[in-house]
């Protein structure tokens, strides 16, 4: 079920005015995400998310090579599926910290405040978004434009899905952000299939390690 853009914008206006989240103007999963964001102190007026230091980001990326290496072959596939729309494919760890970003030059390098590796995307920091919310919901989630909790993410529509290891534990999130909300329906199944492919890569890597 989707809600008109005007309803979502009105929900945001009401929240910023009186601190109340209207239950009748938001999808159920978005209401839950906003409530979590509010309770954890996310700032709805933020124009961008906080980041780790350069050194901490470098260390995190180095310690997450297994996840990045498994996901990267699927980045270009997802990017091609989006087509000419402005977009970015993003990968995070299980703490919602971005590890890698792939997409068109305009979106990634020329959009002020666009998330980069080391960006903190948990709902506590960045509010409802295509990384932190799938992690909190433990399932595929879409965040369309103004459904994002912080204003800086409103130009984008995002969808994300958790990545799980052999034990079923969430180890990261795979997400796509696009400026056009119209592409999300055709990308949903592709994103989920890519996530399954990455999870299969985890299994293959572990089997190869056992053989050695």
Where in the sequence are the language-model features?
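Fold-independent oxyanion-binding glycine-rich loops
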Residues: 94, 145-147, 161, 179
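A gly/proline- and charged-residue-enriched helix-loop-helix capping module
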Residues: 122, 126-129
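A short beta-strand signature within small-molecule sensing/ligand-binding domains used
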Residues: 152-162
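Membrane-proximal, non-catalytic sensory/regulatory domains of signal-transducing membrane proteins
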Residues: 141-153
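A generic local secondary-structure boundary/capping motif
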Residues: 78-79, 131-132, 147, 160
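Soluble sensory domains of the PAS superfamily and closely related sensory modules
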Residues: 129-141
């Amino acid at each position: 079920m989707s809600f008109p853009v005007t309803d979502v914008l009105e929900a945001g206006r009401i929240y910023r005015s009186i601190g109340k989240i209207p239950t009748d103007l938001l999808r159920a999963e978005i209401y839950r995400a906003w409530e979590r964001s509010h309770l954890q102190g996310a700032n709805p007026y933020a124009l961008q998310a906080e980041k780790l230091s350069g050194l901490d980001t470098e260390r995190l990326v180095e310690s997450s090579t297994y996840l990045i290496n498994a996901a990267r072959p699927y980045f270009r596939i997802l990017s091609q599926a989006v087509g000419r729309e402005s977009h970015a494919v993003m990968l995070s760890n299980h703490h919602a910290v971005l590890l890698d970003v792939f997409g068109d030059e305009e979106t990634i390098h020329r959009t002020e405040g666009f998330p980069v590796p080391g960006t903190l995307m948990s709902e506590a920091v960045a509010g409802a978004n295509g990384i932190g919310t799938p992690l909190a919901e433990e399932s595929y989630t879409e965040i369309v434009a103004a459904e994002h909790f912080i204003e800086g993410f409103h130009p984008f529509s995002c969808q994300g899905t958790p990545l799980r290891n052999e034990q079923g534990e969430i180890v990261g999130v795979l997400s796509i952000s696009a400026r056009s909300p119209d592409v999300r329906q055709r990308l949903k199944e592709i994103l989920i299939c890519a996530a399954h492919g990455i999870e299969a890569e985890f299994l293959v890597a572990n089997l190869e390690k056992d053989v050695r």
